[in-house]
Curated annotation (Swiss-Prot):
Keyword field contains Flavoprotein: yes
Active site per database record: H275 (proton acceptor)
Membrane topology, from the record: Peripheral membrane protein
Main location: membrane
InterPro entries registered for this protein in UniProt: Aldolase_TIM (IPR013785), Alpha-hydoxy_acid_DH_FMN (IPR012133), FMN-dep_DH (IPR000262), FMN_HAD (IPR037396), FMN_hydac_DH_AS (IPR008259), LldD (IPR020920)
Enzyme kind, highest EC tier: oxidoreductase
Originating species: Salmonella arizonae (strain ATCC BAA-731 / CDC346-86 / RSK2980)
Name of this protein: L-lactate dehydrogenase
PROSITE patterns hit by this protein: FMN_HYDROXY_ACID_DH_1, FMN_HYDROXY_ACID_DH_2
Catalytic function, reaction form: (S)-lactate + A = pyruvate + AH2
GO BP, one annotated term: lactate metabolic process
Gene name for this UniProt entry: lldD
UniProt-annotated location(s): Cell inner membrane
Cofactor(s) named in the record: FMN
Lineage: Bacteria, Pseudomonadati, Pseudomonadota, Gammaproteobacteria, Enterobacterales
Sites where the protein binds FMN: 106, 127, 155, 251, 306-330
Length: 396
């Protein structure tokens, strides 16, 4: 199979993975309206083509939180990453490390902090949820700090799990889910051998280390469902600061006022994100939300963005809309499931090449030269008909 884009990796991953795993990462909340809009809105951001600009000294390098990145991209935290390839977090982190960009380990990773961090040359980032069990949160923060993690990504858009219809249909949840997953694995022998048998243990490593006992998929679903904390508030940031003195990024911002609050409460960065369309359907796409947020806080706080990014052109679009750096989620999971570390490394090479093409043809020699001036029109200020506000009929 010829691989020339993230879409090719998606097609390959769908063939390789048991359906419960493919649809877990591929799906979104409710009718998946926001999931689709993330991609569609971003694809309609028009860039100004500029020519005869002597682009021979083009550079993608940037700096974030005193770290030098080879390009303005980081790998996002993804739960159960180690179910998509054998010790998947270790493989994905190695690809990011070799490329000179950060890898973010999820709270609910298969591989624990202590397994991933020692394999890397550069410090990784760690993602944390607000959970009812504050003892676990403190333990995770202390372990992340001891392992040399440089940046904390604090996810705030999951006070409760989203309603993900696909999960019930695919076998991730719902009636007879464990039996359905078993038979799906049997029907996908490549995955069953590489990950199902040789990728053990399939614990949630960070949680198992705290609880002192193995945790499987059913524990993952049950433990998280019982521990997400709807009482989360901005004061939780103050509590976290007692145990974390490094850069802290608030992930899950879609409103300018929340972005301003993040500045007021001392966050170092925000991620403009709707959780890849996996939490509340019908909210703004990240591309649509980003310009107003950038207008509100650009220069006061680092702005990262995710959701809908599938190629290097999308990275340039997000930066033109106001982001400093982007996070890749689904795209790298597809590559990881298809070819492990080599797949992620190849995807990052493709994104780098695509960014260079886009920057060359828009006359931007450096990341700092990509701005609103690079746009034909800024998304959300002069919307074409396809991006008009959702009507009542669209919501049904």
């Amino acid at each position: 199979m010829i691989i020339s884009a993230a879409s090719d990796y998606r097609a390959a991953a769908q063939r390789t993975l048991p359906p419960f795993l493919f649809h877990y990462i591929d799906g979104g909340a409710y009718a998946e309206y926001t999931l689709r809009r993330n991609v569609e809105d971003l694809s309609q951001v028009a860039l100004r083509q500029r020519v005869l600009k002597n682009m021979s000294d083009l550079s993608l390098e940037t700096t974030l939180f005193n770290e030098t990145l080879s390009m303005p991209v980081a790998l996002a935290p993804v739960g159960l990453c180690g179910m998509y390839a054998r010790r998947g977090e270790v493989q994905a982190a190695a690809a990011a490390d070799a490329k000179g960009i950060p890898f973010t380990l999820s709270t609910v990773s298969v591989c624990p902090i202590e397994e991933v961090a020692p394999t890397l040359k550069r410090p990784m980032w760690f993602q944390l949820y607000v959970l009812r069990d504050r003892g676990f949160m403190r333990n995770a923060l202390e372990r992340a700090k001891a392992a040399g993690c440089s940046t904390l990504v604090f996810t705030v858009d999951m006070p409760t799990p989203g309603a993900r219809y696909r999960d019930a249909h695919s076998g991730m949840s719902g009636p007879n889910a464990a039996m359905r997953r078993y038979w799906q694995a049997v029907m996908h022998p490549k995955w069953a051998w590489d990950v199902g048998l040789n990728g053990r243990p399939h614990d949630l490593g960070n949680i198992s280390a705290y609880l002192g006992k193995p945790t499987g998929l059913e524990d993952y679903i049950g433990w998280l469902a019982n521990n997400f904390d709807p009482s989360i508030s901005w004061k939780d940031l103050e509590w976290i600061r007692e145990f974390w003195d490094g850069p802290m990024v608030i992930k899950g911002i879609l409103d300018p006022e929340d972005a301003r609050d993040a500045v007021r409460f001392g966050a170092d960065g925000i991620v403009v994100s709707n959780h890849g369309g996996r939490q509340l359907d019908g909210v703004l796409s990240s591309a649509r939300a980003l310009p107003a947020i950038a207008d509100a806080v650009k220069g006061d706080i680092a702005i990262l963005a995710d959701s809908g990014i599938r190629n290097g052109l999308d990275v340039v679009r997000m930066i033109a809309l106001g982001a400093d750096t982007v996070l890749l989620g689904r795209a790298y999971l597809y590559a990881l499931a298809t070819a492990g570390k080599a797949g992620v490394a190849n995807l990052l090479d493709l994104i780098e090449k695509e960014m260079k093409v886009a920057m060359t043809l828009t006359g931007a020699k450096s990341i700092s030269e990509i701005s609103g001036d690079s746009l034909v029109q800024e998304l959300g200020k002069s919307l074409p008909a396809a991006l008009a506000p959702m009507s009542k009929g669209d919501a049904t």
